[in-house]
Amino acid sequence: MERKIRVLVAKPGLDGHDRGARVVAAALRDAGMEVIYTGLHQTPEMIARTAVQEDVDVVGLSIHSGAHMTLFPDVKKLLDENGMSDVLLTGGGVIPDDDIEQLQKMGVGRLFTPGASSEEFVNYIREQVEKKWAQAKTG
């Protein structure tokens, strides 16, 4: 039996709005994924530590504070430093298109903005992780 996709949903920084993160976490659970939700006010170090401890396949950041150009690169760097460069870093929030393009050039996966459907992010995560697992099997 193939294991469930493990997703860490995190709310970095001082943003106190977590309704979107909770909706995402519920949709991923409903799709059969194992979800670890960090709660509010996480530092990049806390997120990376939890990702390592939980051995996740995906880290999803929910950012509505405008600090995405700092938080995504900081988490990416810490994941890489902890041997988790193969973990998909994705997320969403109110992020301008130009910033999305820059973040993706830094190695961040697809980013979802308000209005994205749960089907979109569930399918994206499933496709990316299953592709990684298939590549690992073929070596």
Q: What do these predicted ranges mean?
A:
Residues 127-139:
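The C-terminal output helix
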Residues 1-4, 84:
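Short, flexible coil/linker segments at domain boundaries that flank nucleotide/cofactor-interacting
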Residues 21-123, 130-131:
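Cofactor-cradling patches in redox/metallo enzymes
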Residues 10-14:
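N-terminal pre-triad scaffold of radical SAM enzymes
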